[in-house]
A protein has these predicted regions:
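Short loop/turn segments immediately following beta-strands, especially the blade-tip
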Residues: 2-5, 44-50, 89-99, 146-155, ...
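A short beta-strand motif characteristic of beta-propeller blades
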Residues: 8-14, 53-59, 102-111, 157-163, ...
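Beta-rich catalytic cores
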Residues: 18-20, 64, 117, 169, ...
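Residue-level detector of Asp-centered blade-edge/turn motifs that repeat once per structural unit
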Residues: 25-28, 70-74, 124-127, 177-179, ...
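Short loop/turn segments immediately following the C-termini of beta-strands
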Residues: 36, 82-83, 92, 135-137, ...
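Asp-box/WD-like beta-propeller blade repeats and closely related beta-sheet repeat scaffolds
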Residues: 53-124
Length: 306
């Protein structure tokens, strides 16, 4: 409820295997989900009461799908696979069901038959380019690529590639509303990077790198998610195992970041977070099975539990 912030469960689909990430179609009448431990993607109709009705499930062949999104025309569903190291473009039918795979784009590994493990598929604000972060994980290369999208065929063409340091492992990125400033977090390196993006050429230019944990932290930590607040003034990053959130103010003229603080997430292993339509920040803690609501102060950049 947006009135009192309370959550009410209305349905539980108990037969679904590890529905690890979901997205709406552009009408928000359909939902698509990847099944993280398998090679499956499912479609659902969203009914008037908010419950889901399963439409179909397809096997794309790529193992461990981790992210899913829909193109601007609502014609294709894009899926990133971690162990498969491949982006899959799937035809979206008018009834919301998933059709055939019409295009693929694979990140090669260090040896023949090996891949770089893709962890995200992020559109620019106009949905003309896709940014896909990949972790090296021994057999591949840690990287982020900019890919030009063919709206008719669903195919991708690389326009630029950023290679990270060995073991830093790029995980997720987020695009600023101005479509020029791109921010990416590196999982093992515990860093957040700032890039300038040129939508005319599809090129990325790395300009800044900051830590996502305080310098006093000596233990293990994994950066997991990066988001921009609704005002477009701040970048936020969640850190697993140190169980914290890092906040950075964005310079409105240059896009450079300045840290405003590190905040406890009040749970264990914050794997994902997002902002609601009410401006609240919701942090999902994987190992404590909790979602914690925070108020985000746009004046100070502070996260305050509600």
């Amino acid at each position: 409820s947006e009135v009192d912030g309370r959550w009410t469960e209305i349905q539980c689909l108990k037969t679904e295997e590890n529905p690890s990430f979901q997205c709406f179609d552009n009408t928000k009448e359909y939902l698509y989900s990847v099944h993280g431990d398998f090679t499956l993607v499912s479609s659902y109709k969203i009914l008037e009461d908010g419950t889901l009705e399963h439409i179909n499930t397809i096997d794309i062949g790529g193992k461990n799908p981790v992210d899913v999104t829909v193109d601007a025309e609502n014609q294709h569903v894009i899926v990133a696979t971690l162990q498969g190291g491949t982006l899959y473009t799937i035809k979206r039918n008018e009834d919301g069901s998933l059709g055939d795979v019409v295009a693929t784009f694979t990140y090669e590994g260090k040896e023949e038959g090996k891949v770089s493990t893709i962890h995200q598929c992020l559109w620019d604000q106009k949905k003309n380019y896709l940014f896909a972060c990949a972790q090296g994980r021994v057999n591949g290369f840690g990287q982020m690529r900019a890919l030009k999208y063919n709206h008719e065929t669903g195919e991708f063409t690389e326009t630029d590639k950023f290679l990270s340091r060995t073991w830093d492992e790029p995980r997720h990125a987020v695009m600023h509303p101005n479509n020029r400033w791109l921010y990416m977090c590196e999982e093992k390196g515990n860093k957040v990077l700032y890039f300038q993006f040129d939508e005319e050429t599809g090129k990325m230019k790395a300009l800044q790198e900051l830590t996502t944990v305080p310098e006093t932290v000596t233990g293990y930590s994994d950066a997991s998610e990066v988001m921009i607040d609704p005002s477009g003034q701040y970048v936020l990053v969640s850190n697993r195992y140190t169980d914290s959130m890092a906040v950075y103010r964005i310079d409105p003229f240059t896009g450079y970041m300045k840290n405003t603080g590190f905040f406890p997430c009040l749970g264990k292993t914050p794997r994902f977070f997002c902002f609601g339509s009410n401006g609240k920040c919701y942090v999902a803690n994987e190992d404590s099975d909790t979602i914690i609501e925070f108020t985000f102060d746009e004046n100070t950049g502070w996260l305050v539990p509600t």
